[in-house]
Every structure is written in structure tokens, then in C-alpha cells.
Amino acid sequence: MLTIIESPLFSKLWRNYWTVEDHGEFAAYLPANPEAGDLISGSGGCRKIRWTRSGMGKRGGVRVIYTARLASGSVVLLTIYAKGVNDNIPAHILRKLAEELGHEG
């Protein structure tokens, strides 16, 4: 089982979108499915996964950007945002964020 590591940014933002229960469901799902998100081209291995929010329906989902460090047994949650707010974060920004957090590629 992989360990979840939250970036300071993710830790600050997730409460804007999820209940504690939503957060727990996601934290239980991702370690078992680390490659579930779409690979973001040019990002150095970052992935984007779509996830729902309680009571928000199909259109009220969020996007979570993360990187899987399979060799070290961890998944790093980089950021979270509402669907439609930031459709695409530039790959070079994601790559830089992952590098700063010690992503191993």
C-alpha cells in the first residue's frame, strides 16, 4: 500500500472542496489505484484525476493533481481545484512543483 503525502498547498485547499469523509474516501482510493489519473504531458509524471464532491452532482467535481513515487511507496498530492476553474495548469509549473517536492520521476 502506498503512503499519501500532501503538499502544503493541497493541505491548505482541500477543505474548500471536500468534507472530511470525502477526503478519506479519496485517500483510501488513490493508494490502491495510483495510475488512475490521466498522465499530463510534459509534466514530469504528474497525473490529473477527476473526483466528485458530496451533494454537488456531476458538474460539481474537482481535479486533483498528483505524482506517484512508486519506487519509494508514496503518492504526493500537489493541488486540488474545482472543475472549470483551472482546466489546464501548465505542465512546466507542475513539473517544477513536483521537483520542489522531491519527485523521483
Name every feature range the model reports, one short phrase each.
Residues 40-79:
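Basic/aromatic recognition patch in beta-strand/loop cores that engages polyanionic ligands
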Residues 68-105:
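Enriched for short, Lys/Arg-rich terminal
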Residues 20-25, 32, 45, 50, ...:
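Sequence/structural signature of beta-propeller domains
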Residues 30-41:
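Small/polar-rich, solvent-exposed N-terminal microdomains that initiate assembly or binding
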Residues 3, 47, 87:
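Residues that recognize and position ribonucleotide moieties
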Residues 1-21:
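Arg/Lys-rich, positively charged N-terminal/basic patches that mediate binding to nucleic acids
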Residues 6, 22, 26, 58-61, ...:
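Amphipathic alpha-helical interface surfaces
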